[in-house]
């Protein structure tokens, strides 16, 4: 509760200390900025909104549905022109967005879908299934199509976690000599990725690879492997973070990841919000998929802030 109050106070102070731009206010709400993916979303959306002449409020719900509800309510009370949201849950988010819509505040979702259409104006998400297949194909290649491996799963309430896992197994399960010896949830967390990897490694010392539902967990797994002297174990992630880029280029355990373009996705959401505010339409379907890109040693140098340069 104290954290919630602190966030709301910060949001209120931010609103009161800005001089509003002519175009009004856009609220940008994401999960915790401790995760560089979500920070890239927030930074990308903020940059584009201010470039287009809007004042911005940036806040994090920390994957807490109640906190998210309060932040959306605050955005509505501040008469925001639009909300850019990476939500705290596909089901629990619907009610708050329905209230925002009824109050005339349109929502533009990024990264995570909700389980209802017609509530948000746009849902712009990565093609998680396609990206997971890219990661899995590279993982199988790096593993030589055989060996014991581990899968680290994301937060169970996040549909992206299950979609990515399904994409992984659509590819990996075609190879009978690939043997999954452990599958554990690490909740998108680097700390949990480290602790899960430590315990899994003790129980399964012969593992050859780790495939992870995001880069943050992959980095935690890599740290545990390094601490155990296991530089031989292959790790493949998902997201396209700069930290993973650095590991790939340095020849660390992490060999590849699937880039989901957080920066570009967030900026596109703001562009669509601006068009909707001005014209009443984005000119696009509500649900939009952005394909992921495989990142490995061949192109990692071009990666910066979840965006790949030409």
Swiss-Prot record:
InterPro entries: Peripla_BP_I (IPR028082), SBP_2_dom (IPR025997). GO terms for cellular component: periplasmic space. Belongs to the bacterial solute-binding protein 2 family. GO terms for molecular function: carbohydrate binding. This is D-apiose import binding protein. The lineage of its organism: Bacteria, Pseudomonadati, Pseudomonadota, Gammaproteobacteria, Pasteurellales. SUPFAM superfamilies: Periplasmic binding protein-like I. Residues 1-21 form the signal peptide. It holds the Pfam family Peripla_BP_4. Transmembrane segments: none annotated. Part of an ABC transporter complex involved in D-apiose import. Binds D-apiose, D-ribose and D-ribulose.
């Amino acid at each position: 509760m104290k954290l919630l109050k602190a966030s709301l106070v910060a949001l209120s102070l931010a609103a009161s200390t800005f001089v509003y731009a002519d175009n009004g206010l856009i609220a940008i709400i994401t999960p915790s900025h401790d995760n560089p993916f979500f920070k890239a979303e927030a930074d990308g959306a903020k940059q584009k909104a201010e470039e287009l002449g809007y004042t911005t409020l940036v806040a994090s719900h920390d994957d807490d549905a109640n906190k998210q509800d309060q932040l959306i309510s605050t955005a509505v009370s501040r008469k925001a022109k639009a909300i850019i949201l990476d939500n705290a849950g596909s089901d629990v988010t619907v009610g708050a967005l329905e209230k925002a819509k009824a109050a005339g505040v349109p929502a533009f979702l990024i990264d995570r879908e909700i389980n209802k259409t017609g509530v948000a104006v746009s849902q712009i998400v990565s093609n998680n299934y396609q990206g997971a297949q890219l990661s899995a194909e590279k993982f199988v290649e790096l593993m030589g199509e055989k060996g014991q491996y581990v899968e680290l799963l994301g937060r169970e309430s996040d549909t992206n976690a299950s979609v990515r896992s399904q994409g992984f197994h659509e590819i990996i399960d075609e190879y009978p000599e690939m043997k999954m010896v452990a599958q554990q949830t690490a909740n998108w967390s680097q700390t949990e990725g480290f602790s899960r990897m430590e315990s899994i490694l003790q129980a399964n010392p012969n593992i050859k690879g780790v495939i992870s539902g995001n880069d943050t967990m992959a980095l935690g797994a890599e740290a545990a492997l390094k601490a155990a002297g296991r530089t031989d174990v292959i790790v493949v992630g998902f997201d396209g973070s700069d930290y993973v880029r650095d590991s790939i280029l340095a020849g660390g355990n992490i060999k590849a990841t699937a880039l989901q373009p957080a920066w570009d996705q967030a900026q596109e959401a703001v562009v669509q919000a601006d068009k909707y505010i001005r014209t009443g339409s984005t000119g696009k379907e509500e649900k939009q998929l952005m394909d992921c890109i495989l990142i490995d040693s061949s192109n990692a140098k071009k990666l910066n802030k979840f965006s790949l340069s030409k």
